[in-house]
Amino acid sequence: MGLFACCTKYTRLSTDTKMKFPYVALSYINVTLCTYTAMLVGYMVTFNDSSELKYLQYWLLLSFLMSVVLNAPTLWTMLKTTEAHEVIYEMKLFHAMYFSNVLLNYVVFLDNQMGTNFVFVNNLIHCCVLFMIFVELLILLGHTMGTYTDYQYVKSCYMVILFVSVMSVTIVMGLECLKTKLIDNSLMFNAFVCALYIVIAIMWSLKNNLTSYYVSNLQSIQVVPFSYNDPPPPFSNIVMDDIKNKK
């Protein structure tokens, strides 16, 4: 009973609180932390050699730097971001992770020295991308049907689900299957992912524009009160007329 009593004290963050704590409220911070944590945990559980961990260090550093460069405009105006901005941020984040992995495999580590590590990181990125696309489509569908109203809150919940799921699968089953065969590394798949993310961002942008359009029109509507030529009689006259009629 004490656990349920503690849960009943939980309250959602208000708009004023979100403005005071922007780093907690913005969901793309949670996306970055959960995605990199899932990649880090999955890699360290699968590989434990010093040279293989060196590949992880290079990849984390390079992907983080590329993500900062690609998302510099979004990070500069993080207080003014919308759902469309966050979707584009997510797309750039995964592209930074992907291209840094390709750059390490073909430029830094030559002669296919880290081919297994490259395959594993590539496959794990693909799994995260497919999961996040499913989450974005699910949130967009729920928002359209009126089920989800707070994009940041719902997305943060799904990020926690992603982290817990990856941890559970890694501990119980392991991720050895992801380092045996490359899933798909073609440009067609990357173009498809880009197009899908752009379509989702356009849908969010259109929804926000339509919502603001309807709100502005509703605010401009003025209700004209009914005008009567003859004012209603006072209450005393109504009572006197009723007494006279009874007599």
Curated annotation (Swiss-Prot):
Subcellular location(s) of the protein: Host cytoplasm; Host nucleus
Keywords, alphabetical: Host cytoplasm, Host nucleus
Any one of the GO CC terms: host cell nucleus
Entry function: Accelerates mortality in insect larvae.
Name this protein carries in UniProt: Protein AC124
Organism of this sequence: Autographa californica nuclear polyhedrosis virus (AcMNPV)
